[in-house]
Amino acid sequence: MTTIQPAPMAFFTNRPTTEIARDLLGTHLLYTSHQGTLGGLIVETEAYMGAQDTAAHAYNGRRTPFSEPLYHEPGTIYIYQLRSFFLFDIVTQAVDQPQGVLIRAIEPTHGLAQMQRNRPNKPSVNLTNGPGKLMGALGIHDKQLTFKNVATAPLTIDLANRRQPRHITTAPRIGVNAKAASGQLPYRYFITGNPYVSGTLKKDWDREQHGWL
């Protein structure tokens, strides 16, 4: 692998958050810690559109200590807890425009053995095929990286070694209120046929190329 190129703040602004969510597919999510560098190719994302999005933490301009990171500069890390899981959201758009992208799944490429130790007895795709699962595999179990920026943090997006998807599927987001105004909007993006996408059926997997060109 060539030198890592962390995504700059400019990557996360000056275009729609939906476009950013699509563009993150095929980039590497990497985390460097005492365990080494762990991570993989991003294969599934969800866009959250801020104050007008009924599924967003900042819906109606809600601003609390919990959601404060969303109001910071583009590329800010927003880690939050959902039950026993920690989830990773990247802030998009300019300061005080609280939009973001949730990283839902990755295909492991770095430190697979260590990720398997971090999530023992989770074979094959179950290791990282969900937003909480991938964070556990990376060994992230707290919010300490929140407010840091992926441009300089040990948790980063590598733009230099990306892969191109053959096809991207759009769909409604998972786990949101489907009856709310934004509930059925197609703000979820994933690599068609990739086995690590959450909730996919084995019959739909591309077992040879995993959906990559």
Curated annotation (Swiss-Prot):
<keyword id="KW-0227">DNA damage</keyword>
<dbReference type="GO" id="GO:0003905">
    <property type="term" value="F:alkylbase DNA N-glycosylase activity"/>
</dbReference>
<dbReference type="GO" id="GO:0006284">
    <property type="term" value="P:base-excision repair"/>
</dbReference>
<dbReference type="InterPro" id="IPR003180">
    <property type="entry name" value="MPG"/>
</dbReference>
<protein>
    <recommendedName>
        <fullName>Putative 3-methyladenine DNA glycosylase</fullName>
        <ecNumber>3.2.2.-</ecNumber>
    </recommendedName>
</protein>
<dbReference type="GO" id="GO:0003677">
    <property type="term" value="F:DNA binding"/>
</dbReference>
<keyword id="KW-0234">DNA repair</keyword>
<keyword id="KW-0378">Hydrolase</keyword>
<dbReference type="Pfam" id="PF02245">
    <property type="entry name" value="Pur_DNA_glyco"/>
</dbReference>
<dbReference type="InterPro" id="IPR036995">
    <property type="entry name" value="MPG_sf"/>
</dbReference>
<comment type="similarity">
    <text>Belongs to the DNA glycosylase MPG family.</text>
</comment>
<dbReference type="InterPro" id="IPR011034">
    <property type="entry name" value="Formyl_transferase-like_C_sf"/>
</dbReference>
